[in-house]
């Protein structure tokens, strides 16, 4: 699927990537403007809203630093998306959340309050995702939103494939409960 920046003339985006890799800040700014909304949306779904802005900036700092490593084997947006997912995963691991949220202890997930905070507040899909426990949210976003397979998620997060499947099942149940107002 082509992203907005790649629907331009291919040479324009390729040119910006090449120029930015050579240190051209204006070209990097164009790349940033083309891709920031999608990357921020991804970080918002995988992390808390409060962390999304900071992590999005971290992703683009890392992009600037690693742009010289982009070989063009895939679309720039694919490379950037993968870099973003890696930064988010690294961020979560650095806070030692990984062990707690990926434990096989279902009691940790059962402690989630699934009802809306206020009955009169309209619950939408994004807020339902935010209500998921961090591990379930991450797997839900990677699988159902971003389209990764369980085996790919297992490798990315260093978990068992079965853990990914259980977390996704639990996330879907919690989403249903949250969206139905139960």
Identify the meaning behind each predicted range.
Residues 3-4, 99, 105-130:
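Acidic, proline/glycine-rich intrinsically disordered inter-domain spacer in sigma factors
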Residues 68-72, 82-103, 117-118:
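Arg/Lys-rich amphipathic alpha helix in sigma70-family domain 2
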Residues 21-22, 46-49, 58-75, 94-97:
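Sigma70-family region 2
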Residues 130, 134-138, 146-163:
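Helix-turn-helix DNA-binding module
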Residues 3-7, 21-29, 40-58, 161:
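Short, charged helix-capping/linker segments at alpha-helix termini
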Residues 85, 89, 136, 157-181:
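DNA-recognition helix of helix-turn-helix
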Residues 32-50, 66, 129, 174:
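Amphipathic, Lys/Arg- and hydrophobic-enriched alpha-helical face
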Residues 54-61, 74-86:
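Structural recognition of an alpha-helix C-terminal capping motif at a helix-to-coil junction
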